[in-house]
Structures are given as C-alpha cells and as structure tokens.
Amino acid sequence: ALKAEVYMWTARAYSTSAVVADLDVAIASIDAIPGASGGSVSFVTSDWKSIFKRQANDCPEYIWANYFDYLVGPKNNLHDAITLRIDNVPIEMQGTFPIAVTDEGLNRIEIGSNMNTIFRKYETIEAHDNPFDKTDDAGPFYDKRDLRYINSMVDTNGDGSTNVCIKFPGILVTTDNRRYWDNDLPIYRWTGMLLLKAEALLAKGQTSAVVDILNMTRTRAGLANYSGATDFNTLENELLDEVAREMLAENQRWWGLIRAHKVGQNVPRFMANRGDDSTDANIWNFYYWPIAESVKIKNDKLVQSPGY
C-alpha cells in the first residue's frame, strides 16, 4: 500500500504528464495486496457502516491502522466531529446511527447551506421515516440517497434533508453515560487502494475500468451506477469527489488533490492565504508544506513555509 502511494506520487505530483512506468508499479503494488495479506483483505459488499469496527483486525477492509482504545489512551480520537448530539436527534431515530449520550460540545453534521457541495449533491431530497427502508415514500429522488450519509430527519435548514455520517461510531458505555470515539484509525483501507488504482487507470486512459471501480463504491452506498461523461477531466473530478465521500476522515483527499494539481480549484484559500493568485496556473508547480515546531527547534536554520 505504501509503495503504491509513493509511486502514485512520483507518477503524478511532480508533473502534469503522468509517468507511465510509475503508474504501472503502483497498480501492480495494489494488485498484490490481497495475496500479501494471505487473503485477509477484501472489499466489503454489504452494510457500509459495518466496515468501521472498533478494532482493525475485525474489518477485512483494513490493511494498516493505528491502535486506539479509550481505556489506555485519550477518550476521543476526534471522530466525534462526524457524530450528532443527542439533543438534535428525534427519539425514533436514535438507534439508527451513532449519537452522543450527552451534549459534549458536539456540532450538528449538516448537509445543507453550510455543508461542502461534494456531500450536498448527494443529500436526501425529502424527509423519510426510515432511511434504511427502501419501500418508504422516498419518491423519485431515492437513488440520490447515499447510505454513507443517512437522513436524520433533523430539519435544521427548513428543507427536511439534514444528513449525518455513520462511520467510526466508537463505543457507547452506558455505565459512564457517554460515548467514547476510539475506533482504530485506518492508514490504508482496501477501498482507498481501489480508488487509488482507479486514479492510476484513469491516467492511463482506461476509463471503463475506472467506472467499474466507481460503481463498486456507489452500489454499496445505495447509489445508481455512474452515468456521467467519461472524458478525463469529468471523470477525474468525479473520482476526487468519490474519495471525499468514501474516505471522509481518513486523510486521503488532500493528497489526491495535489496529485491531480487541483488544490486551487477545491481549496482556493490555500494559496490566497499565502499571497498568491490562485487563478495563476503557474503557481501550482509549488506546494508549501508546514515545518513542525519540534523540527524547527532542533534545526534553527530552517525557515517556516509561508502562510503557517
């Protein structure tokens, strides 16, 4: 997995023209993962939320993860940021997705006027009694119900269509009257590797194979197969968006934006905050990385990158 990521970086990040030999190494490295794991790594085809077990060894999708347990470390690994407070959730919905037992300073997770447009395009159009019941009154927009972001019937925007992510639920400890967010933190997950492979295949012009991988993740999310254009730019943007939806809170999208040279399109303030013109294509050969304070302390000759 690490080798594949390294070669995808050398294949795409340093030039707008992909290095085919490096793409081939990345693809071969990804294809070798199931065998190298003794067959223990596989794509989960049903119940998306079941992928995210507290312990990585219980999930066939996890390739490499950092151990986490509230009993021996911090009580919260920040996944509470994608969890609803209980005071936002109707009683009839409280067993549907992970919630906090008490108001611990958590914010609503909304898909509406304040939410990233990547998620908003898959928001549930109508309010539903049961987001898991395909026979309810979903109407003509049912195929836009992304099961990764379940309708919660919390009508905060007046449109009846607020959603919540259902991954990394941690554990509800009733004796403590609270939820601990202590899922093991995935570094590499098999679906992420498949999407990385799709990126490599797209760079080689193999668009049908890219669509096949997109449809794997879309089908599991309850979405219709991809039916959009298959020119390079359109498909690349769709792939970047799918990584954002599927790999939320798994630290993958940023690196994909850099490899695609599309940070400016998606995070324009990244360059604007550094005094550069985000509309100038020439600046995208340069990316500024922060230098950790601990590193600067050890080497006082280092100068912090602009903007940090």
Residue ranges and their predicted role:
Residues 39-203, 263-308:
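Elongated scaffold/linker segments in the mid-to-C-terminal portions of large proteins
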Residues 1, 57-59, 252:
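Short, solvent-exposed loop/turn segments at the edges of secondary structure
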Residues 20, 48-49, 207, 255:
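Sparse recognition of residues in long alpha-helices and their boundaries
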Residues 1-15, 19-34, 64, 146, ...:
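Extended, hydrophobic/aromatic-rich amphipathic alpha-helical segments that build helical scaffolds
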Residues 36-47, 225-228, 250:
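Acidic/polar loop patches that form or flank catalytic/metal-binding clefts of enzymes
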Residues 213-272:
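C-terminal structured "cap/appendage" subdomains that terminate the fold
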